[in-house]
Amino acid sequence: MQGRIVKSLAGFYYVESDGVVYQTRARGNFRKKGQIPYVGDWVEFSSQDQSEGYILSIEERKNSLVRPPIVNIDQAVVIMSAKEPDFNANLLDRFLVLLEYKMIQPIIYISKLDLLDDLVVIDDIREHYQNIGYVFCYSQEELLPLLANKVTVFMGQTGVGKSTLLNKIAPELKLETGEISGSLGRGRHTTRAVSFYNVHKGKIADTPGFSSLDYEVDNAEDLNESFPELRRLSHFCKFRSCTHTHEPKCAVKEALTQGQLWQVRYDNYLQFLSEIESRRETYKKVIKRK
């Protein structure tokens, strides 16, 4: 039998096949091979009934996320709050870099707009991201049609309202929500397991919140490719390996000078590039000591 893992909990993998969910375990040979089944995996399995079955093999994955452990994702809704916590373009760009690198379509959703006195600043931010090519949503009405026939992950900084949004989209889920800690400005983690839910003709996953995000991009070329506007401009740079920092005849820097590139995004790119270089130097020092 073939199906997709829709839930993982306490060593059991719940596999959906033809609308029926089977409780399964992974064969011991998976551990020997260092393979771990994840939510989203397409698998071959055997089962005598719905409560006892075994996963026999895992199909090749098209993409994966480490945090949360989920695979074969079509798109990700990155939820950023307008306030409490304040909107953070740097954190948003970290999510976007990860998703671009993983070839997962991002959707930006802004929550808590009612806490703003006006939308002027957020509207300006929205225009910048839309000009890059990102889908940017303010409401459930804008978001819901995008969920059909897709596997969608919901992600974002803790306290931005992921579970609250999902409860509005699908009240039957009754997901626990948490308030912001006044002293830290951080939300409490309220999601304990990764599961798929059938919502609006698609599958969605609510995932553990993040207070920070580590992305897997570890070189300048991949970082450049993960910024769509830089990726497009880099074809016109004089040097193929241009890092858009000091090189002459750099199309990115020229676009920045002409006001055709958003300074905020470029500054975040430079920060991420600096972090990559710092990690590389640290790694070299560790290797040298060995």
UniProtKB/Swiss-Prot annotation:
Boundaries of every CP-type G domain copy: 62-213
Binding locations of GTP: 111-114, 156-164
* InterPro entries in the cross-refs: G_CP_dom (IPR030378), NA-bd_OB-fold (IPR012340), P-loop_NTPase (IPR027417), Ribosome_biogen_GTPase_RsgA (IPR004881), RsgA_GTPase_dom (IPR010914), RsgA_N (IPR031944)
Q: Name one GO biological process term.
A: ribosomal small subunit biogenesis
* Localization (cell): Cytoplasm
Where on this chain does Zn(2+) bind?
237, 242, 244, 250
The superkingdom of the source organism is Bacteria
Describe the task this protein carries out.
One of several proteins that assist in the late maturation steps of the functional core of the 30S ribosomal subunit. Helps release RbfA from mature subunits. May play a role in the assembly of ribosomal proteins into the subunit. Circularly permuted GTPase that catalyzes slow GTP hydrolysis, GTPase activity is stimulated by the 30S ribosomal subunit.
Q: To which protein family does this belong?
A: Belongs to the TRAFAC class YlqF/YawG GTPase family. RsgA subfamily.
Gene behind the chain: rsgA
Write the Enzyme Commission number(s) for this entry.
3.6.1.-
Query: What is the recorded name of this protein?
Result: Small ribosomal subunit biogenesis GTPase RsgA
Give the species this sequence originates from.
Streptococcus agalactiae serotype V (strain ATCC BAA-611 / 2603 V/R)
Annotated cofactor note: Binds 1 zinc ion per subunit.
Subunit structure as annotated in this protein's UniProt entry: Monomer. Associates with 30S ribosomal subunit, binds 16S rRNA.
Needed cofactors: Zn(2+)
| Keywords for this protein | Cytoplasm, GTP-binding, Hydrolase, Metal-binding, Nucleotide-binding, Ribosome biogenesis, RNA-binding, rRNA-binding, Zinc
Q: Which GO terms describe its cellular component?
A: cytoplasm
Q: Name one GO molecular function term.
A: metal ion binding
Which principal EC class is assigned to this enzyme?
hydrolase
